[in-house]
Amino acid sequence: MKALILVGGFGTRLRPLTLSFPKPLVDFANKPMILHQIEALKAVGVDEVVLAINYQPEVMLNFLKDFETKLEIKITCSQETEPLGTAGPLALARDKLLDGSGEPFFVLNSDVISEYPLKEMLEFHKSHGGEASIMVTKVDEPSKYGVVVMEESTGRVEKFVEKPKLYVGNKINAGIYLLNPSVLDKIELRPTSIEKETFPKIAAAQGLYAMVLPGFWMDIGQPRDYITGLRLYLDSLRKKSPAKLTSGPHIVGNVLVDETATIGEGCLIGPDVAIGPGCIVESGVRLSRCTVMRGVRIKKHACISSSIIGWHSTVGQWARIENMTILGEDVHVSDEIYSNGGVVLPHKEIKSNILKPEIVM
């Protein structure tokens, strides 16, 4: 069985992290975002994943080589020479997705994090006998999104309404699809939208069905949503695999600490914190609602909240980092510095306070 992951372009919304790595390789909960998806696909019998990409394919493939061997799954790239939207990449990868078996294939948006109930989706797809299945999720403010109007009893999709001014429903496209090979015949090789062009055609022919996603869902393509997504992911881990979370007298709420990280005495860590491989957290540090990526050193009595600390950075003693501060790779914050929402590009040294949200070049 095959799957296509829509990787897309430059990840500008997640800069400065994406200045060092393509967005799917940015760590989320201590492993690359895309690895969460590849592992979920492997678990339901997918043996080949095609990455639809237009930026740094060689970096992606080199990085994922080890995981290809470890997970026993084939990973290939389909490279766009121009942006093809959300449907064009399927036409471009047609030969990689068709193997003559007639089996459906998965399509995933690489920005989406969820519990990936792909086994249930396979069963749902077989049960309705339609041409395509999409996953939908309920949201509080549907007017920001394209809303999927569906028949509640069967799941059959009636129509899509883009950013409705009046309430028509609260279910939106969750960016996870299961498609029969025949769907590829409906997509031309040009820049085109699967949501606005392909799916409405299939829905008009009564062949499109929607399954309501159980559990959490988040598009983590920008920093604020990334932080929220981490909270939802750790909540889910607490319910499903609590042994993976860290516990102890210095831990508050849900915290994920890599086994190679070290934490000093008198720290208070949590809630909603991920600490990556090789990190050193010195004594008296306070961390909450943040991600600390691989190889970071946080010195004594520093305080970090609602922020992302990029790979191999250093935060000085008594420094205070908060309010969606994002440190790129290899950033060094001096002792006693305050950052209020600073976005700091890689390889910088911060020697003066950042008093309001700004980009430090």
UniProtKB/Swiss-Prot annotation:
GO cellular component terms attached to this protein's record: cytosol; nucleus
Source taxon at top rank: Eukaryota
Effect of residue 11 to S: In hsn1; reduced enzyme activity, ascorbate concentrations and N-glycosylation, and increased sensitivity to ammonium
Disruption phenotype: Embryo defective arrested at the cotyledon stage. Deficient in N-glycosylation, altered in cytokinesis and cell wall architecture during embryogenesis. Mutants vtc1 and hsn1 with reduced enzyme activity show reduced root length and leaf cell size, reduced accumulation of ascorbate, increased sensitivity to ozone, UV-B and oxidative stresses, increased levels of abscisic acid (ABA), salicylic acid (SA) and resistance to virulent pathogens and root growth inhibition in the presence of NH(4)(+).
Broad class of the protein's primary localization: cytoplasm
UniProt entry tagged with the keyword Acyltransferase: no
SUPFAM superfamilies xref list: Nucleotide-diphospho-sugar transferases
Listed Gene3D superfamilies: Hexapeptide repeat proteins, Spore Coat Polysaccharide Biosynthesis Protein SpsA, Chain A
EC assignment: 2.7.7.13
Result when mutating residue 27 to E: Abolishes interaction with CSN5B and subsequent degradation in the dark by the 26S proteasome, and increases ascorbate accumulation in seedlings
GO molecular function terms attached to this record: GTP binding; mannose-1-phosphate guanylyltransferase (GTP) activity
Binding site for GDP-alpha-D-mannose: 6-7, 85, 109, 111, 146, 173
Protein family membership: Belongs to the transferase hexapeptide repeat family.
Domain notes: The N-terminus (1-40) is necessary for interaction with CNS5B.
Role, per record: Essential protein during embryogenesis. Catalyzes a reaction of the Smirnoff-Wheeler pathway, the major route to ascorbate biosynthesis in plants. Plays an essential role in plant growth and development and cell-wall architecture. Provides GDP-mannose, used for cell wall carbohydrate biosynthesis, protein N-glycosylation, as well as for the biosynthesis of the antioxidant ascorbate.
Protein name: Mannose-1-phosphate guanylyltransferase 1
Species in which this protein is naturally found: Arabidopsis thaliana (Mouse-ear cress)
